[in-house]
């Protein structure tokens, strides 16, 4: 009997959200969790997110959909926008799970070149399933160069993963 894949997703929530919104649509996180499970055999999906006290309903919903939330206290940037600065947390969690041999392959969801070293390392160890970048135009050239054929974009996923408000008729 063939062993089923056990892949983990590591999601840069801020980058994902901004990237999808820059294309004019909102991601349906419930559909996205199902997509990750079915398409990439993701058994555990971590979302790295800055903690905003007023967003508890969102956090509850994400957990209900099957995500593991990893919070970071936010700070206000120079532009007064909240910043979670989750990069180090995502890399640390991914490396702990790699070191403990907890997953077969990693799905990294970001456009941020700060994750180049992680992606490069996972490629060298044959541990990278795919890098999912929200938007081709905003994806780091470092990620494009490193992930190569293992890089996919959300441009073609809108019909499948777009959040549509339920009509209240």
Residue spans of the language-model regions?
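Terminal and domain-boundary accessory regions
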Residues: 1-169
């Amino acid at each position: 009997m063939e062993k089923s894949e056990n892949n983990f997703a590591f999601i840069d929530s801020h980058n994902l959200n901004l990237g999808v919104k820059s294309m004019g649509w909102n991601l349906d996180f419930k559909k996205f969790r199902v997509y990750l499970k079915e398409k990439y055999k993701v058994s555990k999906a971590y979302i790295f997110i800055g903690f905003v006290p007023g967003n508890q309903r969102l956090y509850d919903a994400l957990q209900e959909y099957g995500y593991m939330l990893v919070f970071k206290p936010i700070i206000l940037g120079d532009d007064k926008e909240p910043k979670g600065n989750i990069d180090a947390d995502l890399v640390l969690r991914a490396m702990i799970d790699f070191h403990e041999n907890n997953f077969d392959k990693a799905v990294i969801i970001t456009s941020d070149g700060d994750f180049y070293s992680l992606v490069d390392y996972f490629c060298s160890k044959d541990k990278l399933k795919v890098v999912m970048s929200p938007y081709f135009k905003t994806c780091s050239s470092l990620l494009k160069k490193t992930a190569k054929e293992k890089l996919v974009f959300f441009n073609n996923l809108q019909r499948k993963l777009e959040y549509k408000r339920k009509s209240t008729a």
